[in-house]
């Protein structure tokens, strides 16, 4: 060891070199991925290439909960409200997640409407071409049906609309930081103040 260099202290496994992922032929890998996508589209025809439909959910934590994204699957309550049996749903391209819970009415109604829209657009091919069962689409619809190559029913993030108002003297005097601090203090001392008020009322009655 010489000079003022960092002492090597690598925490590697004995055979770490076997697990190094390399990419020496990137153009060929790109071609391979494209061919794999095409083969998959042929294999799953006439289903959409994007996979099953997913619900609209809000992201977790305080930082991201204002953003909406695709979730894992629809809840059993959402399927019931849309009139879709839970065992039928995965067979017609609807993702189901029995762990997820509906915590808001708006989210519940949005996903129910999403399911109803999907159901109205859905074209169901018969398992056997010669035997048509109840629920299968008409021959005219089957003839005109094409495979959806793009993301079907994409989630659109609505931009909030802002209204311009005239600035008043009360608005200029209002201090948002002080207001937040005051409300926090009031919340923190609510229990103690209620207890003191109850004790004072008791003393007055005596």
Swiss-Prot record:
GO terms for cellular component: cytosolic large ribosomal subunit. One of its GO terms (biological process) is translation. InterPro entries: Ribosomal_eL13, Ribosomal_eL13_CS. Keywords: Ribonucleoprotein, Ribosomal protein. One of its GO terms (molecular function) is structural constituent of ribosome. PROSITE patterns: RIBOSOMAL_L13E. The keyword Ribosomal protein applies. Belongs to the eukaryotic ribosomal protein eL13 family. PANTHER family: 60S RIBOSOMAL PROTEIN L13, LARGE RIBOSOMAL SUBUNIT PROTEIN EL13Y-RELATED. This is Large ribosomal subunit protein eL13y. It comes from Arabidopsis thaliana (Mouse-ear cress). The lineage of its organism: Eukaryota, Viridiplantae, Streptophyta, Embryophyta, Tracheophyta.
């Amino acid at each position: 060891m010489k000079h003022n260099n960092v002492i090597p202290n690598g925490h590697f496994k004995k055979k770490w070199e076997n697990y190094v992922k390399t990419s020496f032929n990137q153009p060929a890998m790109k071609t391979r991925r494209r061919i794999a996508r095409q083969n998959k589209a042929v294999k799953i025809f006439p289903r959409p290439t994007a996979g099953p439909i997913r619900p609209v959910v809000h992201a977790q934590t305080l930082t991201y909960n204002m953003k909406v994204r695709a979730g894992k699957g629809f809840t059993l309550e959402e399927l019931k409200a849309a009139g879709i049996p839970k065992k039928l749903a995965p067979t017609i391209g609807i993702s189901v997640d029995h762990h997820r819970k509906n915590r808001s009415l708006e989210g519940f109604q949005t996903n129910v409407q999403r399911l109803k829209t999907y159901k109205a657009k859905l074209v169901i091919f018969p398992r056997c071409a010669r035997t048509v069962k109840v629920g299968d689409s008409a021959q005219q619809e089957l003839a005109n049906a094409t495979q959806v190559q793009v993301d079907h029913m994409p989630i659109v993030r609505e931009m909030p609309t802002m209204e311009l108002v005239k600035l008043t003297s009360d608005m200029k005097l209002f201090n948002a930081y002080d207001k937040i601090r005051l409300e926090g203090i009031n919340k923190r001392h609510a229990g103690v103040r209620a207890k003191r008020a109850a004790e004072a009322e008791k003393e007055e009655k005596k």
